[in-house]
C-alpha cells in the first residue's frame, strides 16, 4: 500500500458521542441515526444520576444531554461536566430555552428533529 505524500487529507476520525436522555426509545433512535452518519456512539445513559460518572468513564468528544431528564435538569448536568463538550437537546425549540442556554456552559442547543452529525460538528466548530 502506497503512503500518502504531502497534501493528502488526514483520515476521517469518527466523532465519539454519548447521549443522556430519560426516554429509551429516543436513545435508540438517536444512536441509529447518528451511527448511520458515521458518529461513534460510545454510550447511552438513561438517568441524570448515572450521567456524570458514565460520561467521565466514556470520555466522549461530545455529550448530548436532554434538557428535561425527568425531574433533573440538563442545564445542571452540563455544569457538572466542565471537562466535557455538552450539547443540550430537546423536543422543543431553542427559543423556549434561549436564556438558559446562553447562561449554561454548554456548546449549544439542538432541537431533537435537527439532530445530525453536521449540526453537532457545526456547533462544536463555533467554540
Protein language model regions, located:
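Acidic catalytic/metal-coordinating carboxylates
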Residues: 47-50, 68-76
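Acidic, metal-coordinating helix/loop segments flanking the phosphotransfer/catalytic sites
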Residues: 44-62
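Two-component/phosphorelay signaling modules centered on CheY-like receiver
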Residues: 24-43
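Non-catalytic signal-transmission and effector/linker regions of two-component phosphorelay proteins
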Residues: 1-16, 115-127
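As written
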Residues: 101-108
Amino acid at each position: 500500500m502506497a503512503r500518502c505524500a504531502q497534501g493528502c487529507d488526514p483520515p476521517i476520525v469518527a466523532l465519539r458521542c454519548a447521549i443522556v436522555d430519560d426516554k429509551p426509545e429516543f436513545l435508540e433512535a438517536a444512536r441509529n441515526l447518528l451511527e448511520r452518519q458515521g458518529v461513534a456512539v460510545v454510550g447511552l445513559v438513561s438517568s441524570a444520576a448515572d450521567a456524570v460518572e458514565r460520561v467521565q468513564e466514556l470520555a466522549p468528544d461530545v455529550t448530548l444531554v436532554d434538557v428535561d431528564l425527568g425531574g433533573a435538569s440538563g442545564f445542571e448536568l452540563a455544569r457538572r461536566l466542565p471537562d466535557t463538550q455538552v450539547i443540550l437537546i430537546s423536543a422543543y425549540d431553542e427559543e423556549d430555552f434561549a436564556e438558559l442556554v446562553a447562561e449554561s456552559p454548554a456548546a449549544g442547543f439542538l432541537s431533537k428533529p435537527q439532530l445530525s452529525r453536521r449540526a453537532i460538528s457545526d456547533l462544536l466548530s463555533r467554540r
